[in-house]
């Protein structure tokens, strides 16, 4: 309580409760301490919040890490990003899954940063998938060294709009065809954001129907 009181005096508005104080008892203590003050504070849990307590994280936290730390490799990003569908029932406005930060641009620890090892196509997948998951888009790179490509990824208005849709639904897997996986996220205006991703290492073709997406009639595809 003394810590929270000090943070409130400092004007803090985001708390990342880091390194496994992620049992329900301790998270409840911090939740109650934060809510005892008349200040909006984003309460983020890190990391690897236990799946068995998902309903509690939805009740107690604004976002919770569902994974360990991400690395700027296809293996790491795809393994974390493509395994979030089970959390969808617990996601909604004010309560989000966090599969970790975005690893685009200049990343790393300390003074020796390096450009992300994700290819441009893999970076498109990374940003698009996190947007469909309604996950926090936490920038994990050095903002002082943004190149034009990374800046374009992080400032794509249409992608951000999908991520920030007021309905707050998490996109889920609706179809899998070999290495092709299709995600769909309902939007507040009645439309649907759809993502087709190739998880393989070679070119592949994927198809979908209006029915598989859950829509019918004439549609405008953007």
Where in this protein do the model-derived segments appear?
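Catalytic cores of secreted or luminal carbohydrate-active enzymes
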Residues: 125-176
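Short, acidic/polar
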Residues: 1-9
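Glycan-recognition surfaces
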Residues: 25, 40-142
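Conserved beta-strand positions
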Residues: 12-20, 45, 66, 196
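Active-site-adjacent beta->alpha loops and helix N-cap segments on the catalytic face
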Residues: 21-33
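Carbohydrate-binding surface patches
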Residues: 124, 130-133, 138-140, 176-215
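Loop/turn elements at helix/coil->beta-strand transitions in domains of secreted/extracellular proteins
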Residues: 10-14, 37-42, 61, 189-192
